[in-house]
């Protein structure tokens, strides 16, 4: 089975430096799993890695999408899978690095982003059947094909009843089998999934300092430039943290101090949500940075863990 290394963690925890050092040791090439770094021109606000910071380690899925485009997880999965195969073809170790949990899960969970698991016509048929013969009748259809759902779901819970029937028609599986962890983790990779974390107070301090640094580096001018290029607040890309707040400032809706406050608050809340997301996956190997004295120690721990896995 092909190997896939993952290094994730909340914003500002310090994934970049560690990923570079790991890549040097395992002959790795890095695929970004960041929903903002994928956009062109949005460099400061996304904390996009620079050429110098890459230290000649190849990086992919950075700076490739125009900000006017709507980009989704299905497109990401498609691009990332092709990139992984390309890296394998050169006998290198693919490394997925970033903090966008949904992007990561698109590759390490058995998600289906096609319409193959949806049958709109059958769904409409069942909903019409419920109107004609009653919800109890539609619910009774579960009895012989999915006894567990039949007992668990009430007839009035039509949406879930219909979904259970639809899944069985399309897959031959009960909804429980379809959603099982065995099915969810049925992927073509052997994964090594590390998530960095640190004391929350320290993390929030790092986030606040990073936002201040972004302002010093010219984030306001970056947003002004994006607007002059025709990118508007209604676009998906411009709704990212740091961009939407500064647009409000430039439009005169809030002061700069208020904008910076909101960016810091939004970033801290995002970090909290990221950690909640990563905790849901039992495959994660947690790396608490507070338990190490240096990044070198962390890298050595990761490498030693890779060897023993």
UniProtKB/Swiss-Prot annotation:
Cofactor(s) recorded in Swiss-Prot or TrEMBL: Mg(2+)
Residues at which substrate binds: 11-16
Region (Interaction with substrate tRNA) location: 34-37
GO molecular function: ATP binding; tRNA dimethylallyltransferase activity
Site (Interaction with substrate tRNA): 100, 123
Enzyme class, first EC level, given as a word: transferase
Pfam name, any one: IPPT
Family the UniProt entry places it in: Belongs to the IPP transferase family.
HAMAP family according to UniProt: IPP_trans
Name of the protein: tRNA dimethylallyltransferase
Organism, scientific name: Clostridium kluyveri (strain ATCC 8527 / DSM 555 / NBRC 12016 / NCIMB 10680 / K1)
Gene that encodes it: miaA
């Amino acid at each position: 089975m092909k190997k896939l290394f993952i290094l994730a963690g909340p914003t500002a925890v310090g994934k970049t430096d560690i990923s570079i050092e790991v890549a040097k040791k395992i002959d790795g090439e890095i695929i970004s799993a960041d929903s903002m770094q994928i956009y062109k021109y949005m460099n400061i606000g996304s904390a996009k890695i620079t050429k110098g910071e890459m230290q000649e380690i190849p990086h992919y899925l950075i700076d490739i999408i125009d900000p006017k485009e709507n980009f989704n997880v299905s497109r990401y999965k498609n691009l990332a899978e092709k990139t992984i195969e390309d890296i394998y073809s050169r006998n290198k170790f693919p490394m997925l690095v970033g903090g966008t949990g949904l992007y990561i899960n698109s590759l390490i969970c058995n998600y289906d982003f096609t319409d193959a698991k949806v049958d709109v016509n059958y769904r409409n048929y069942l909903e019409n059947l419920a109107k004609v013969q009653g919800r109890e009748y539609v619910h009774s259809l579960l009895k012989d094909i999915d006894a567990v759902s039949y007992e668990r779901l009430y007839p009035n819970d039509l949406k879930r009843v219909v979904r259970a029937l639809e899944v069985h028609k399309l897959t031959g599986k009960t909804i429980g089998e379809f959603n099982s962890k065995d099915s969810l983790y049925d992927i073509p990779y052997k994964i090594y999934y590390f998530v960095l974390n640190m004391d929350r107070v320290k993390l929030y301090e790092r986030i606040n300092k990073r936002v201040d640094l972004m302002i010093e580096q010219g984030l306001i001018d970056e947003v002004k430039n994006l607007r002059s290029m025709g990118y508007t607040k209604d676009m998906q890309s411009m709704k990212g943290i740091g961009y939407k707040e500064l647009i409000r400032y430039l439009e005169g809706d809030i002061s700069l101090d208020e904008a910076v406050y909101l960016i810091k608050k939004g970033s801290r809340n995002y970090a909290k949500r990221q950690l909640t997301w990563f905790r849901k996956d039992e495959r994660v190997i947690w790396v608490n940075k507070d338990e190490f004295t240096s990044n070198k120690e962390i890298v050595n721990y990761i490498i030693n863990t890779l060897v023993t896995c």
